[in-house]
Amino acid sequence: MARRCQFENSNDIGVFCKLTSAYCLVSVGASENFYSVFESELVPHIPVIHTSIGGTRIVGRVTCGNKNGLLVPNTCNDNELRNIRNSLPDNVRVRRIEEKLSALGNCVVANDYVALIHPDLDRESEEIIADTLGVEVFRTTIANNVLVGTYCVINNRGGLVHPLASVEELDELANLLQIPLCAGTINRGSDVIGAGLVVNDWAAFCGLDTTSTEISVVENIFKLNEMKDENMDNEMRKDFVMNLE
């Protein structure tokens, strides 16, 4: 299911949060309403961690991660890093990365198996991304844009990319990622998809301006309703087993 929300009158919620299937980072200083939208969907399945990164609130643009790990820029201070580490599941690796392109969320898009990265990221950074996130890494662009994390959002089931991506490009990217992709928009026609949308394998959050048609595309390409049905089946199965006992 996809939920609409705003961060202090901004529809670019992906700037202020990072969502994976193992954790969610949200910026400090938001309204209780913003937090409650996330916590009502995610808790107790995964932790929702309130934090800043390097004293800034743009946690979604300066971090990248998946269920296996989290990468933060070298501007992340010791207190922030300690708070994040203490709040994450024990099996999630956390690492600071020295990279001149420090807006990692703009330069990297990843699911639990594959990452697409900015063509100019350091080789050492590429290796750290592969090791920490446990993914195969590919350097690429999307619709001639090097900021792949800005113009693409993926989970393990599908992905939404810049509306000007060609059919050939979609096929090539889908082959790299091994998931279906579609070109589209968020927030009533915005092509800055990474800023307006965050997803994991069962939930999505988007800006308040997102239209019903855009939400329908999101729920279909990321197969959110299928996951919801699977979760309901699992809950019914558990109840059945408990009744037998």
From Swiss-Prot:
Keywords: Cytoplasm, Initiation factor, Nucleus, Protein biosynthesis, Ribosome biogenesis. Signal peptide: none annotated. CDD domains: IF6. GO terms for biological process: cytosolic ribosome assembly; ribosomal large subunit biogenesis. SMART domains: eIF6 (SM00654). One of its GO terms (molecular function) is translation initiation factor activity. It is found in: Cytoplasm; Nucleus, Nucleolus. It holds the Pfam family eIF-6. One of its GO terms (cellular component) is nucleolus. Belongs to the eIF-6 family. Monomer. Associates with the 60S ribosomal subunit. Binds to the 60S ribosomal subunit and prevents its association with the 40S ribosomal subunit to form the 80S initiation complex in the cytoplasm. May also be involved in ribosome biogenesis. This is Eukaryotic translation initiation factor 6.
